């Protein structure tokens, strides 16, 4: 699987359909599948923990058929909002999927943290020395985040730069909320700056890669960064894509 598969084909699969798929995968020797169902539940819990309102969360998390591109930092909020019942359903479904994957000897690849954040909300108002604050502001924080170019006409989420202290703080919260719902994994899928035509000024790919790796390793020292080699930007700049790949640890 890649993320797109989850929206192209699997957005509304129930357990019966997933059970059939997982059994087929086991019969064909697949042992390292991406397990992205219910990733939005992690983000919902993280944002609630930071004091975001339901409306603010709805403006960030995409609807079921667009979750793949939201997870790849390409868009936010499109196709939503999702009802509370959706999050409850998908959390329960992911837990069944993970259990069956492990029963068949598979190693699930869970989504990791790339630096993505809501584009128009000030995280600095909510974080102080790693502790959440229950205050909110709808103003953007230039020091906390940067923005990437539009993706196929969609406004992209914000991105925390690796030298911003809030990167580590949000990453820690992300992995904590992931573990609460789904446990830890030995493999995490992280595709930073996906299909970006332009990047924040002064961005150091090496620093970004180390920050991503360090946060993942803090969650699980044995974890492996699972990187999908589909980083060619929509402008077709192969040199830029290669510089990103070579910089990551």
What are these regions (language model features)?
Residues 1-249:
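Aromatic-lined carbohydrate-binding surfaces of glycoside hydrolases
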